[in-house]
Amino acid sequence: MSVFLCFLVLLPLILIFLNVLKPSKYKLPPGPKKLPIIGNLHQRRTLHPRNRRNLAEMYGPVALLQYGFVPVVAISSKEAAEEVLKINDLECCSRPEAAGMRATFYNFKDIGMAPFGDEWSLMRKLSVVELFSVKKLQSFKYIIEEENNLCVKKLSEFATRQSPVNLERAIFTLVGNIVCRIGYGINLYECDFFEADRVVDLVLKAEAVIRETVFSDFFPGRIGRFIDCISGQNRRLKNNFSVVDTFFQNVLNEHLKPGRESSTIVDLMIDMKKKQENDGDALKFTTDHLKGMISDIFVAGIGGVAGITLWGMTELIRNPRVMKKVQDEIRTTLGDKKERIKEEDLNQLHYFKLVVKETLRLHPTTPLLLPRQTMSHIKIQGYDVPAKTQILVNVYAMGRDPKLWENADEFNPDRFLDSSVDFKGKNYEFIPFGSGRRICPGMTMGTILVEMALLNLLYFFDWGLAKQEEAKEIINGEENFLAFFQVLHH
C-alpha cells in the first residue's frame, strides 16, 4: 500500500520530467548540466553572485538554469541587461512568486514584488508622489540631519572613551529611525512597542524570511507543499515571519489610533481605503496593501542603505590612500568648525560622491536584481526565452567585469573622475538600483541617506580597525563588511 502511495505522489513529477526531456523547439541559452527532476536546484545556494561570474565565463552572458521545474535565465553582460531592462522591459516587467516573498510582502500587495498590473501601477504612483517626490524629499531634510547629528553625539562618547564601536548596530539604528520617521511618522526612541537598538535584528529576520527556500517554489501543486510540511520549512518560515509581522501590525495600529496627527504615505493609504469602501471602487486597498507598503519601506529602506554605508566604511579602511584623500577633500571644503552637517554640503563635494559610486559598483544593494518574470516569449542575445521564465540580472558580475572596468576588483573611485557613467539606470554596466519600469523608486532618497551618513562619519571622526588581528581578514575578506571600528575625534 505504501509503495502504491509513493507511486501516486511521484507520478506527476515523473510525467513532468518526461515532458521536460522532450526536444525543445526553441534555441535555449546554454547552461550547466541538470540532474533528473531537481535540475540545478542542488547548486542554488552555492551560486553566490561571485560564483555566477564563473557561470558567465563558462556559458556566456546568458545562461539557463533549471530550479526544479522553474526555468531561470542568468544575465551578466550590459548588452543582455539592456535587452531585458530596456528593449523587452514591458515583456519582462512581472515578478515570479516565492513563498518567502509572498509572506514578507503580504501576498505581493506591495511595490517591489507585486505582479505587473493596475494594482502595482497605483502603488508605485503613490510612492513616487507621496514619499519620493522632490517636494517630499525636501520636507524630510530636517529629519535626516537631526538623526545624523544624534548619531554623531553617541559616537563621540565612544571616541572620548577610545573604545571600539559596533558601527553596524549604530548605522542600522540611525537609518532605521530615519526611515521610520519618514515612512511611518514614528520615532523609535519614543516608541512603546519596539526598541530602536533592535532594528538590525529585525531587518535580518525579515531578510531571512525573504531568502527562505521552500520546495513549493520549485515543484508544482501538492507535492512541493507536502515536502515543505514534513521538512519543517513552512513552520520555520511562519515562525520567522511572525516576529516581523508583529512589528508591522503595531505600526499599522499606531496609524489607526483616533486623533493621531500625522501625514505619511501609510495615513494616505488608510484614507484612500476608507474612501474606496464608501465609493465602491473596483480597485480597493486592503489591510494587506497597507502592510505591504510598510514592509517595503522597512525592508528595502533600512537594509540596503545601512549595508552600503558599512561597505563604504569597510572599503575606506581597506584603502587608507582613498580614506585620506576623501577626508582631506571634506575637511578642506567644509572647514574645521562645522557643528552640524547639512544636506546642502553634499553639493560641494566631488571626490566624496565618487567614493559612493565606487562602493555601489563593488557592493550593489541587491547583487542579483529582484527577479523578473517574462510575460511572453522573447529573445535575448539571439536565444529564446519562453514566457514564465525567471530572469536574474547579475549586477555584481557586471560591476566587476574586467571587459568593462580596469582592475575591476580594485576599490578606486578615481576611475569615475573623467567618466559620465552613472547609476541612474541608463548605463547598463552599472545599475545597482535596476532600470526600466521596475527601477527602485527610492533610489534618490537611498543615495542621500548613504551620503549623509558617510559624510558625518568621515567629517567628525578618524577611523581604524578595532582589533589589529582583524587587519588580514578585512583586507582579504569579501563576504561581509566590518562591524566593529575604532573611532577617534578628528
UniProtKB/Swiss-Prot annotation:
It is found in: Membrane. One of its GO terms (biological process) is defense response to fungus. This is Bifunctional dihydrocamalexate synthase/camalexin synthase. One of its GO terms (molecular function) is heme binding. Induction: By salicylic acid, flagellin, oligogalacturonides, silver nitrate, UV-C and infection with A.alternata and various strains of P.syringae. Activated by the transcription factor WRKY33 upon infection with P.syringae. The gene is CYP71B15. The chain crosses the membrane at residues 1-21. It comes from Arabidopsis thaliana (Mouse-ear cress). Disruption phenotype: No visible phenotype under normal growth conditions, but deficient in the phytoalexin camalexin accumulation upon bacterial infection and markedly increased susceptibility to infection by the necrotrophic fungus Alternaria brassicicola.
